[in-house]
Amino acid sequence: MNQKAYFGEFGGSFVSELLVPALRELEQAFDTCLKDEEFQKEYFRLLKDFVGRPSPLTLCQNIVSNPKVKLYLKREDLIHGGAHKTNQALGQALLAKKMGKTRIIAETGAGQHGVATAIACALLNLKCVIFMGGKDIKRQEMNVFRMRLLGAEVREVNSGSATLKDAVNEALRDWASSYKDTHYLLGTSAGPHPYPTMVKTFQKMIGDEVKSQILEKENRLPDYVIACVGGGSNAIGIFSAFLNDKEVKLIGVEPAGLGLETNKHGATLNKGRVGILHGNKTYLLQDDEGQIAESHSISAGLDYPGVGPEHSYLKEIGRAVYESASDIEALEAFRLLCQKEGIIPALESSHALAYALKLAQKCAQEKIIVVNLSGRGDKDLSTVYNALKGGLK
């Protein structure tokens, strides 16, 4: 057993034999690039000059009514592409280029990873094909247009529930027959090894930046670090720097959808069971017969019935806690941040914010809370408009 492939019992590489050579080649190339000073130098140059890192850490001025609480937002909404997805899309695309690949395939739910992949491919002159569920294409028309504008081919997937998991299945099928010239640029910290570790590596600058920024501003670490969790890449990115700081509570917020008591949610770590999906062992939403259940969230980017294996491990060992926020709570947090702080957040990030605002109200002592504002909400305006019927309170 390859111990590097596992987080406790979670992770691994449960794939068809056709994909074993591709994953082995990818792992070797990734390990080489981690030690390659030229690769690291080029990657961090692009993060600075092209992506616009470091992203700011913003203290909220008006949204928290409890004077004992300081709420900071890690502003991934301000980087190029509008979300944290650009960080690791660029890392993987650069790695693919070093491997001699000429074609990139990717899956996308909210469209944000698809846009980030298309951006990286345009920059690095790589052919780009994006697989996207038909249901998500309808929800995210503007992101589909953005991808095509950036030169990507968008392939509609109408099998299964026509959402993210089905797009992943189609991308894996393509890769099995095309890996000699193609890299599969997986969008979250799930999938077979080495993807969970690779995606975390290309997102960990979020947590590293927060740590130095909060020490500079407050001269101490935060009490809470909070992030939304679908597949979990933005969360593992910000959690990574604080895993050994036991005094910092790490909270992932899953989509409760229409309620945890219904079957219309995406709260995998709250309501799921351990199983295997997309090449890794992790918590999954399953029906009574062990089949993968359909997830639901108002946010397309959280609408996934699995979760990254490291999150399953962090839950098991108690290092992170996984809470949830409903569609209605996320919409209210979205509205509040717009009206109180002048920031339009992604609906994904609004789930983390919703939980943080509830937590802030309960704090009886002075506390510092950091929320990863993983993306901006331009892509969600039509969804929010329809949900609120065009009206705001």
Curated annotation (Swiss-Prot):
EC number: 4.2.1.20
Coiled-coil segments: none
PANTHER family: TRYPTOPHAN SYNTHASE (PTHR48077:SF3), TRYPTOPHAN SYNTHASE-RELATED (PTHR48077)
GO MF: tryptophan synthase activity
A single Gene Ontology CC term: cytoplasm
Family matches, as PROSITE patterns: TRP_SYNTHASE_BETA
Listed cofactors: pyridoxal 5'-phosphate
Protein name as annotated: Tryptophan synthase beta chain
SUPFAM superfamilies (alphabetical): Tryptophan synthase beta subunit-like PLP-dependent enzymes
Assembly, per entry: Tetramer of two alpha and two beta chains.
